[in-house]
Amino acid sequence: MAEKIKIGTMWLGGCSGCHLSIADFHEKLLDVMEHADFEFSPVLMDTKYDEIPELDVVVIEGGIVNDENREFAEELREKAKFVISYGTCAVYGGIPGLRNLWDKDEVIEEAYINSITTPNEEGVIPSEDVPHLEGRVKPLGEVIDVDFEVPGCPPRSDVAAEVVMALLKGEEIELPSTNLCEVCPREKPPEGLAMDFIKRQFEVGKPEDDLCLIPQGLICMGPATVSICGAECPSIAIPCRGCYGPTARVEDQGAKMISAIASDYKVEEDKTVDPEEVAEQLDDIVGTFYTFTLPAALIPMKIKKEGK
């Protein structure tokens, strides 16, 4: 019998949801176990951080938030032959990446001093034996070389299981590369995705059946998001939030979506449309278009003017 492949998993700046998607392999987990053994997984097993063995494959969840994350990532890269960046936090920085809108010191002060849920009358900020925050959240691939990326918040378990099995069998791995709109079952109007208002879900109520959500005034990130999920959310009338990140052809997911919105409003064609009025309909532009990918954007953090 051939020697089994040694697999490890690690949880960095993430929420453990990606590890739950591994547990959700269900019976496919048995197929994985025929080819591999889990040798290291602090989330799923009673293993210690200081006992990282040599691994054939390591699946890493979460981005780089603090110096401990960086140290583990670098050690795992040394110990593993093949590194999978697993989940949107690892691939793009994820929701924790919105921390990049503030300085590190501002984040610490808000968490330990200003937060009403953290009684701290003496104003003590932990400093000893506590990992220090990086200057900004970074995708895993910005700190170490990764061999394959599986985005998703969390990744679909069936897709992830197929990726792992293909890897274990030495088969070629290929994920969908089209945008969400190309696989979405909702109908696009023949005149195009024109819109003249932006609404929130509660303002629309129940969207029209089978009609694309964008002409109904809803911000759906489908035009700027890769179709790995199969358009699960728009299929049940929930606008896509972009949790799988952009296609390989798109360098900046938020910029792509802003361009799509401008096109839907016909900003270039109709000179009576004021782009600033369009922007005013969005309360949180960064939080809307960069919810999951700010650390991987062309401008991955807030740039402050000198003196401000």
Curated annotation (Swiss-Prot):
Xref: Gene3D superfamilies: NADH:ubiquinone oxidoreductase-like, 20kDa subunit
A single GO molecular function term of this UniProt record: oxidoreductase activity
Known EC number: 1.12.99.-
Keywords, ordered alphabetically: Oxidoreductase
Enzyme class: oxidoreductase
Alphabetical list of InterPro entries matching this protein: Hydrogenase_assoc-protein (IPR051349), NADH_UbQ_OxRdtase-like_20kDa (IPR006137), NiFe_Hase_small_N_sf (IPR037024)
Subunit details: The F420-non-reducing hydrogenase is composed of three subunits; MvhA, MvhD and MvhG. It forms a complex with the heterodisulfide reductase (hdr).
Function as written in the Swiss-Prot or TrEMBL entry: Part of a complex that provides reducing equivalents for heterodisulfide reductase.
Family: Belongs to the [NiFe]/[NiFeSe] hydrogenase small subunit family.
Designated name of the protein: F420-non-reducing hydrogenase subunit G
